[in-house]
């Protein structure tokens, strides 16, 4: 679904995650992300998600993606979390699938629900950028303000 407000097109799209807001409503609502299409930028915010092939269609539907806010944390142990959260390697693949010009890692290092080491997501992304200079994927300390390029 899409809506336009103040020349910004806002599009909701499904992601792969569970939902619950109360004791008896598990998976009764749709979990998703948002695309913000402005005159200057097309921004994607994925929120919580696992990797899914449905994202391969999103690049075609949403057009050129200038910036993606991509989850990179809360992924270990994989036998539990793989259905709900991408790990950093899947986040990198998803950024490539979406052909995102710039990707920013979110959803890590703040609240510790899972067992991966605190800085592991950031370390994996930094190493991947060294190995692949075409990868434009940044992270920072949670809570810091960033400037959108």
How would you label these PLM feature ranges?
Residues 1-63, 142-149:
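Core dinuclear metal-dependent hydrolase active-site scaffold
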Residues 42, 50-142:
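Cap/insert and terminal regions of metallo-dependent hydrolase folds
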């Amino acid at each position: 679904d899409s809506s336009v407000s103040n020349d910004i097109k806002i599009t909701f799209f499904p992601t792969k995650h569970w939902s619950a807001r109360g004791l008896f409503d598990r998976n009764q609502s749709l979990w998703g992300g948002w695309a913000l299409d402005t005159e200057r930028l097309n921004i994607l915010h994925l929120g919580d998600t696992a990797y899914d092939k449905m994202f391969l269609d999103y690049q075609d539907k949403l057009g050129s993606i200038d910036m993606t806010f991509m989850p990179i944390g809360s992924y270990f142990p994989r036998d539990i979390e793989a259905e709900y959260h991408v790990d950093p390697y899947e986040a990198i693949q998803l950024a490539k699938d979406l052909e995102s010009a710039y990707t920013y890692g979110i959803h890590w290092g703040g609240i510790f629900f899972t067992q991966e080491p605190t800085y592991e997501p950031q370390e994996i992304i930094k190493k991947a950028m060294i190995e692949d200079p075409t990868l434009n994927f940044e992270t920072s300390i949670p809570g810091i303000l960033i400037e959108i390029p």
